[in-house]
Amino acid sequence: MVEQVAQDEGLAPSFSPERIKQLERETRRDSIGRAWYKFSRNHLSVIGLATVILLVLLAIFANYVTPYPRHAGAFTDFAHAKISPDAQYWFGTDEIGRDIFTRVIFGLRSSLLMAVLVLTLVVPPGVLLGLLAGYYQGTWIDTVIMRVTDIFLAVPPLILALAVASVLEPNLWNGMMAVSLMWWPWYTRLVYGLGTQLRNEYFVTAAELTGARTSHILFREILPNTVSPILTKMSLDVAWVIIIGSMLSFVGLGVQPPEPSLGTMIADGARYLPDQWWIAIFPALAIVVVVLAFNLLGDGIRDMFATEEI
């Protein structure tokens, strides 16, 4: 009634705090709906999302969904060694009688765990350094941060990871540290490029004129406008981290036996190609599926945040 009277008198309607919160919730729901519509238009991205969810659930509940959980550890059964895929052993068995399907699922768990931990370690510092360098462009802060970043980017990522992993004791955690050391500069470079563009936008200038603190400008004004490229890169980087981690395990510098690793399984199975092909092929196919799924998911996230062109 008040809103109607205000409109009749040519005045702007006044809203109660509850009404404002309701409008904010409705706007948020509309934004989520539009984002999902953009994402779902790409059917391959939906398939990628469904595949990623399935793989994550399999990895989390590996102890319950695999037929032979004991085969993920130090288990031997030479009487059932090198059995080809059948109804009992879906992916066959390896050279010492362990179920390959079980070990692939547990190896998938190790790979996803490494990817999550690596991104957790590298994204915050990489983004923070990129924000600082971008906002203070042209100062000594920018120079120091970006020169150090360039040094790391100048070294091939795999070579750097191999060098670090070879110095440390080979295991999952040290492999993770080796990959983390080579990955943060990419986020610094990404956010730096975005920050140099955003620092001259009107909303940043307005915040500076009102006396806002630097932390407010960085984390409340600039950072929210870099979220979509960061999320897109993270979804694509999961696949790359898994590939690098598998390479480290392949050369013996990652996850160590008897703990299953997709890279180690491929290395062990390569000795039995082409006769016992299943020992190496199924772990390799698992990597292909994971990489493809996360790349499709990344494409969908990019489309979801894409600005409509008029």
Regions of interest found by a model, annotated:
Residues 1-50, 296-310:
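Transmembrane alpha-helical segments of polytopic membrane transport and secretion proteins
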Residues 2-10, 58-93, 253-259:
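Hydrophobic alpha-helical transmembrane segments of membrane transport/permease proteins
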Residues 23, 90-98:
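Dynamic helix-loop-helix/coil hinge segments at AAA+ ATPase domain boundaries and subdomain interfaces
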Residues 39, 57, 151:
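Residue-level signature of catalytic and energy-coupling elements of molecular machines
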Residues 43-53, 95-310:
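Alpha-helical transmembrane segments of integral membrane proteins
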Residues 44-63, 127, 288:
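Short, strongly hydrophobic transmembrane alpha-helices
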Residues 55-56, 74, 223-224:
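Short secondary-structure capping/turn micro-motifs that flank functional sites
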